[in-house]
Curated annotation (Swiss-Prot):
Gene this chain is encoded by: DPH5
Protein name as catalogued: Diphthine methyl ester synthase
Substrates-to-products reaction catalysed: 2-[(3S)-amino-3-carboxypropyl]-L-histidyl-[translation elongation factor 2] + 4 S-adenosyl-L-methionine = diphthine methyl ester-[translation elongation factor 2] + 4 S-adenosyl-L-homocysteine + 3 H(+)
Family named by the database record: Belongs to the diphthine synthase family.
Record EC number: 2.1.1.314
Organism: Eremothecium gossypii (strain ATCC 10895 / CBS 109.51 / FGSC 9923 / NRRL Y-1056)
Amino acid sequence: MLFLVGLGLSSHEDITVRGLNAVKRCARVYLEHYTSILMTASKEELEGFYGKPVVLADREMVESGCEEILRDADKEDVAFLVVGDPFGATTHTDLVLRAKKQGIVVEVVHNASVMNAVGSCGLQLYNFGQTISMVFFTDSWRPDSWYDKVLENRRIGLHTLVLLDIKVKEQSPENLARGRLIFEPPRYMSISQCCEQLLEVEEKRGQQAYTPDTPCVAISRLGAPTQHMKSGSIHELAEYDAGEPLHSLVILGRQCHELELEYLLEFSEDQERFKDQVHRDQEFFKPAPWVPPPEDED
């Protein structure tokens, strides 16, 4: 059997009882190690907690060499551990499909992820629209397809969760081209860099999906003991040092409820200014007043 086990957001102790029991019965344990990280638990701590070795599964192993993970899973139990919830990435869905095609039984053990824990910032989950990912820009690659999703969300008044890029066990273009197994140090996108890229793309696209004054909430180390929130405009957060990773950002939608705003004010250094930013932003995509159709003179 293949177990996909969610680990939660921060600590080795965030695993559920059901998930821990599944891991302990498995012959092999793999930890997916490229879409996210456990902020307060090392590989060695996990091995001590589970009482067995843990193999780090990088992007290449999961996407290209998944046969190693699925090896003998029809005869013995194998665990594939995922930070957050198992279905937070499409590659995990692909792994399940491959297992089922081989006749391997799959069991999923869910856990908390950024997709639901983001509610701890005070915004109501059913007021969120499409989630986007912000990747590190390079000199030759500055994707902006996510911009249209933000625009759609904002037009219908919904919040946008922005997931920030991480780079773990990545190769430089030169080392990749030369076939050298030399990897770059891990990198984690910061709130400030995300906001700078947001402003750059708005200047390029010019459709006013948002402005420098659009209110947001910056979320640092969600689910960890050092979790921190800060409310402010995109321009203000572009100069904000959010500290250690991991970081996320929420761009507020027009339909910001009074209770949501009251909660967000607790994270603002200048509450009156932030409240004014929210109220002005609510007018930004305000629908035109309804005009009844002309009556038929006949």
